[in-house]
Amino acid sequence: MPPAKKKPRAYDPAKIRAAVTAQFGHVARGVAELGPEQLARPSGLGAWTVAELAAHIAWIADSLAAGLARPPAAVPELTAVEWPFATASLAGKISEAARETLAGAPLPELYERAGAGMARALEAHTGARVLDLWIGDMTLADFLVTRTVELVVHTDDLNRAAGADIPLERQALAACTRLLADALALKAPGGSVEVRIPPFAVVQCIEGPRHTRGTPPNVVETDPLTWIRLATGRTDWAAALDEARVRASGERADLSALLPLMS
């Protein structure tokens, strides 16, 4: 008899909205403090400069407001946990949108406009609204969870590329970590390996003997930021093991063939 389908993780809509808003505010304040030399640095993401990466983050908020301004879609086609696997096909569109956004106004003005537009749009709509999106139609509630991934991942990118110290909102970091952990479990269903990302997530994955009691024989443990970098291709499995940022025990405790989940 096949195992019962796991119920998707539930997120508190109010906390997610607050986390997205707070993280965008952290980035806006951090970007305002970057100097010309920092903005001209390579971002580490293809050919983007730090300025283009910053413009992309402004676009994240701007595009959310634009999506809510469009007529709603009929039914959702994509859930939050499926979203990471659908992102690769949009890289070209997103890169072009970042360049167009940066050409539109200075960064401080972009952030002020995008933040205000996002706030107005979120105030006017409930999480049940279905957005008509490039990637596939999603409920606003699910799409906002994916915004925590975009914002946390790119805040980390900005910090590393520009030498900044923009804070990560705890609730945004938690939601990002959990969504990417659940995506791993969706990609490799099973119960032979336990992946621990304290204090936010524990999932089981990979086909094989399911552990039911005591200490699991196959365990992977890491911290949230290392997990996010692994899941998004910012670092690789071997390097994380060598640097002791990942602890893996058991013959099945190897996630290298499953990572990254998105890039």
Language model features by range: what are they?
Residues 2-51:
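An N-terminal domain-cap segment
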Residues 2-15, 63-116:
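Short, helix-capping/interhelical loops that line the mouth of catalytic, cofactor-
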Residues 2-6, 70, 85, 89, ...:
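C-terminal interaction segments
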Residues 16-23, 107-114, 144-147, 173, ...:
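Amphipathic alpha-helix face/heptad-repeat signature
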Residues 41-80, 130-179:
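Short, contiguous alpha-helical
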Residues 94-147:
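Internal, conserved structured core segments that host functional sites
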Residues 171-199:
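A glycine-rich beta-turn/hairpin centered on an aromatic-Pro dipeptide
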Residues 189-226:
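Glycine/small-residue-rich hydrophobic helix-like segments
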